[in-house]
Amino acid sequence: MKKTLLAIILGGMAFATTNASANTGTINFNGKITSATCTIDPEVNGNRTSTIDLGQAAISGHGTVVDFKLKPAPGSNDCLAKTNARIDWSGSMNSLGFNNTASGNTAAKGYHMTLRATNVGNGSGGANINTSFTTAEYTHTSAIQSFNYSAQLKKDDRAPSNGGYKAGVFTTSASFLVTYM
């Protein structure tokens, strides 16, 4: 009896001190070290804004080209002195440009937005930003005061396989990362 009781007590103690396993995981942290940091804002016709109005496009064609700039915020002297930079773009893209991310019955079909760097200097650019060309490199002999772009709604060259062209709302978002070199 004593041996049985001792075995029960020792067995209970062994289980009482056992640690429970917990799930593990991984956390990713990203950062960037640059020689210049500053706030970059989109600007249309001298007005800083985070929304670019592409206007309207006829269902049979293209919209009007809308010019805008990415400019360092006032007082960003470190950034305003740089002559070389690159801008990496990401978003919902295809080989033509940026996709329409609007959904539902009111979404336009068969259209995309082109985005083109227009003042790259001696750098690489001038082509539409798309899945094959996501970076515009700026190489200037004097300080880069702004990164100039044009955006335009365009009818896809190929007819959509999901019911053809349809008038409606066009919405897309693009993220950019400026790296000064």
Curated annotation (Swiss-Prot):
Record has Chloroplast as a keyword: no
Residues spanning the signal sequence: 1-22
Biological function: Fimbriae (also called pili), polar filaments radiating from the surface of the bacterium to a length of 0.5-1.5 micrometers and numbering 100-300 per cell, enable bacteria to colonize the epithelium of specific host organs. FanC is the main component of the K99 fimbriae.
Protein family according to the UniProt entry: Belongs to the fimbrial protein family.
Name of the protein: K99 fimbrial protein
InterPro entries: Adhesion_dom_fimbrial_sf, Adhesion_dom_sf
Principal subcellular localization: other
Gene Ontology terms describing biological process: cell adhesion
Disulfide bonds: C38-C79
Site positions for Required for receptor binding: K154, R158
Annotated compartments: Fimbrium
UniProt-annotated site: Required for stability and transport, residues: Y180
Keywords on record: Disulfide bond, Fimbrium, Plasmid, Signal
Superkingdom of source: Bacteria
Native source species: Escherichia coli
One GO cellular component, as annotated: pilus
Key word Signal present: yes
